[in-house]
UniProtKB/Swiss-Prot annotation:
HAMAP family reported in the protein's UniProt record: Nucleos_phosphorylase_PpnP
Function summary: Catalyzes the phosphorolysis of diverse nucleosides, yielding D-ribose 1-phosphate and the respective free bases. Can use uridine, adenosine, guanosine, cytidine, thymidine, inosine and xanthosine as substrates. Also catalyzes the reverse reactions.
Cellular component annotations (GO), alphabetically ordered: cytosol
Protein name per the record: Pyrimidine/purine nucleoside phosphorylase
InterPro entries: Ppnp (IPR009664), RmlC-like_jellyroll (IPR014710), RmlC_Cupin_sf (IPR011051)
MF annotations from Gene Ontology: guanosine phosphorylase activity; purine-nucleoside phosphorylase activity; thymidine phosphorylase activity; uridine phosphorylase activity
Keywords: Glycosyltransferase, Transferase
Assigned protein family: Belongs to the nucleoside phosphorylase PpnP family.
Any single Pfam family the record assigns to this protein: Ppnp
């Protein structure tokens, strides 16, 4: 079953689904800066555009262009900055 999610006044939208028993979402992040909290560990893969990421506890922003991934621990969070719309795949680990 597909589940639509909308965050930050519609600036981040995703569709959730299950694949091989694991939850995943695919989505689009519009231009802006947003903070996400995590319950479970996640792997984010940028599939279009580029995102700058800063994980909780860090002062450093790291750029992730299309085709690259990063992981975030559960019960934590991260900031995302997009200078143009970008697409992503989120896998819950």
């Amino acid at each position: 079953m597909l589940k639509h999610n909308s965050y930050f006044n519609g600036n981040v939208q995703s569709v959730g689904f299950e694949r091989h028993g694991r939850r995943q979402t695919v989505g689009v992040i519009d231009t802006g800066e947003f903070h996400f909290s995590t319950d479970a560990p996640e792997r984010m893969t940028v599939v279009a555009g580029e995102l700058a990421i800063r994980v909780d506890g860090s002062t450093e922003w790291r750029a992730y262009p299309a085709g690259t991934s990063f992981e975030v621990a559960g019960k934590s969070g991260f900031d995302v900055r997009a200078t143009q719309p970008a697409g992503y795949l989120c896998e819950f680990l």
